[in-house]
Each structure stands twice: as structure tokens, then as C-alpha cells.
Amino acid sequence: MRDRLLAAEKVKAIDWRDDALYLLDQRVLPFEEVWHRYTTAEGVAEAIRTMVVRGAPAIGISAAYGAVLAARARIAQGADWYPALEEDMQLLADSRPTAVNLFWALNRMRDRLMRVKDGDDPLAALEAEAVAIHLSDREANLTMAQLGADLIRKHQGNLQTVLTHCNTGALATGGFGTALGVIRAAHLEGMIERVYADETRPWLQGSRLTAWELANEGIPVTLNADSAAAHLMRTKGITWVIVGADRITANGDVANKIGTYQLAVAAMHHGVRFMVVAPSSTIDMEMASGDDIVIEERDGRELLEVGGQRVGAEVEAFNPVFDVTPADLIDAIVTEKGIVERPDTARMAQLMSRKHLH
């Protein structure tokens, strides 16, 4: 399966070369493919904040490279560079508050810096660490893809009709995707009849990104309005809902793109299995439950403007980016460490105590 996934790879969103970070601008896909070059932490933070790059794993990887760019600039300034570097790290951390991969990656960069020995090059150490974060996410994607496909076969070996939400493919990660990685692997093994992709308002990641990725690989995909999801489950034989995650808490609650919670409720009602696919870096064992998650809200103009015109001067907007799906609505969480079925606090702790990949 690994070789087949590698052979099918067509899309990437992050490239590190010539001492600069290149990001594919996901705001203009699929109509344009525009790459931006970044040489400062400030630029990377702005790219994360404005969603040039999005998807929890991709945000974490980009932040790690942003830390390298910050270190290069600060070290060049001479003595006492570390406090200034920490300010840059905080700037990166503040760019998106919900995706735990962002903080995980920056903490890993801090830890690596603390382990640099006297006489060693801190910049080289940080660059190597950022590259390692990038490559490890790619490897995690491959492992999760196989584990998720195996889980589908375990429960239902026949052709599957899958519903997915937002974008969880190569554009959102350092490799092949989380939820879309599982769908890719299942398709290569002949188990996918059709994928239904929620359009995912208001940024339309499903229609602009997911449908584009799947169509490019010849995977049968149908785009649907978010509000059609429950009707699809009732009438179109949906067998799995497969989504990603931006943060998973110690009890198995999942923060993901707004609309995920209502999918889980509808899936439970219709007897449709619900799978979450995310690397272990998305799991925050310091956060007890989803009640503790800070939910990012974006500018109301994303909802209030249609065709550049405001819909009503007195109308207010509620525009949360994420919601929290309780663990008791989730059939399985798939990570590179293994699978947790019917997640709870004890099962999540057991998963995270594993020292080796599944």
C-alpha cells in the first residue's frame, strides 16, 4: 500500500528549499495555483492567520519552518537573540488558537533548541528538527491511511459510500492526508464506490479543495451542500463519515471544522459509522475535555457579505471556525500509533502511552 500511495501522489502544499518556505495559496484554489515565498516568521504567521495554509498538521509544519526563519534572523543580530526568538515563537503561536499541532510543533522546536550543546550550530539543529517534523507527518499519513482502510474492511468489506467534511488531504498535511488519506487507501483497495464531500461553508474547503483533490486522482466524488448531509445518510446509503481533527482532548472529544458535530449527531441517528483520523500530535492530553477548548471565531463579514455586498446593516454574524464532537458520538479515532474504538479517557491514555508506532 505504501508504494501505491507514493505512486499516486499528485499534490503538495508545503516546500522548504533554498532557506525559504514556499506555501501553495489555498485561498485561490482550484482556479489558480499560486506559490508564495516566505523568509520571515512574521510572513509565516500572517500566512497561517489568513489561511494561505490551513489544516492542523500543515499549520504545525509551517510554524516549525517559521521558527527556523526567525532563528536565522535573530542569531544574525548577535548576542541575546533568544528572547527575541521567543517573541517570534509567540507570534506564530497566536496565529491560530485551536489547532494544537501548532503549539506541539513550536514546543518541539523549543525543546530542540534547549538540547543544543555548546559549540553546536543552533540554526542547523532547528532546521533539521523542522524537516523531521515535516517528514514524520508524511510517514504518519501513510500509516494512518493503511490503518483506516483496514478498519473499514474489518467492519464492512464491501463497496463503501463515504461522506467527508472540510479538507483533510495533501493540502492540509505534510503528506497524503488524514481522512482523505484513508479514503485514498480504501479506493486503491477497491472499497470506495463514491465520496460525498460537504462544501464546508463559509470558506468552501470541500468544494474548492477536497473535490479538486479527489477528482484529480480519479476517485468518484459528489459535492453536496452542508445542509444535505442528514438527507444523504437517509437516502444515499452512506456507510462511513470520515473526518479529520484540529484538537483531540484526553477523553476523546474532537474539535474540528464547524459542522462536524452535526454530522456526528446525524450519523448516530442513522447508524452510520463515524471515523476521526489525525496524527497523535493533534491529541492534547493536558486538556481534559472539549469543554476546555477555545473555539476560534472569524470575521463576521465572511457570512454577511454576498458578492461583495453586505446583506443587512443591522444583521450580526456568529462565525465559529470549529465545533466540538463528544467522544460518545465517535466510533473510532485513527492515529499513527493505532486505533481507539469507542474512545474514552482510559483508551486515549493507553494509546498515548505507546512508545512505538502501531
Swiss-Prot record:
UniProt KW keywords? Amino-acid biosynthesis, Isomerase, Methionine biosynthesis
Q: Name one GO biological process term.
A: L-methionine salvage from methylthioadenosine
Which residues carry the site feature described as Transition state stabilizer?
A: C166
EC code: 5.3.1.23
> According to its UniProt record, which protein family does this protein belong to?
Belongs to the eIF-2B alpha/beta/delta subunits family. MtnA subfamily.
So what does this one do?
Answer: Catalyzes the interconversion of methylthioribose-1-phosphate (MTR-1-P) into methylthioribulose-1-phosphate (MTRu-1-P).
Record's protein name:
Methylthioribose-1-phosphate isomerase
Gene, per the UniProt record:
mtnA
